A protein has these predicted regions:
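Cell-wall glycan-active module
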Residues: 1-86, 181-182
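Solvent-exposed, acidic/flexible segments
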Residues: 56-67, 76-77, 81, 99-104, ...
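Phosphate-coordinating loops and pocket residues in cytosolic domains that bind phosphorylated ligands
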Residues: 89, 112, 162
Length: 182
């Protein structure tokens, strides 16, 4: 009888230890997950680079119907929100019906050929913003620098390659300066 009671105590003690271990492990896992999610240093370099230079703040007053669409498009394609909001402000001043003298269309001022390549309708505000964010991200992937991505968005990637940097065109230099802030 004494050995049965002793076996039951050992069994309860083992269960308690196992439960304690599981609880402590769960708490540590939750803390580590939170710490990792909030630590820029622990993020992969490709993710850290997304935010380089993005001490940029969108200071425009527009908060209308396209604002959230633009923020969502930026997030969806890994573009810093403030950078994309500043781009849209510069490109069209939030005018969905804008058409430039060169033929660029909509909020993100997509050229018809670029819109076709991206498979978006440039006259649809949501598709236009999605295409603009996707195209800016593609330029970032190509040049690995947000300022060069902006220059490529404005002057074309070939011009950035040809000049091995921001092309010496006053329009493009001013474009990058206005959006980037320097």
């Amino acid at each position: 009888m004494a050995s049965a009671v002793h076996a039951q105590d050992v069994n309860l003690s083992s269960k308690s230890r196992l439960q304690l271990f599981e609880n402590q492990t769960r708490i540590l896992d939750e803390r580590a997950t939170t710490q990792y999610a909030n630590s820029a240093r622990l993020l992969p370099e490709s993710v850290r680079n997304l935010s380089k230079g993005v001490g940029l703040v969108y200071s425009g007053s527009y908060r209308g119907q396209y604002y959230q669409l633009a923020k969502s498009a930026a997030r969806r394609h890994g573009v810093p929100e403030s950078l994309f909001l500043r781009l849209v402000q510069q490109e069209s001043n939030w005018n969905a019906g804008a058409v430039s003298g060169k033929g660029a269309i909509g909020l993100a001022q997509l050229m018809p050929g670029t819109a076709r390549m991206l498979g978006v309708n440039p006259r649809d505000p949501g598709e236009n913003l999605d295409g603009g964010a996707r195209y800016l991200r593609a330029q970032y992937e190509r040049f690995r620098d947000w300022r060069l991505a902006l220059a490529a968005y404005n002057a074309g990637p070939e011009a950035v390659e040809r000049h091995d940097g921001i092309p010496p065109y006053s329009e493009t230099k001013n474009y990058v300066r206005k959006i980037w802030g320097s």
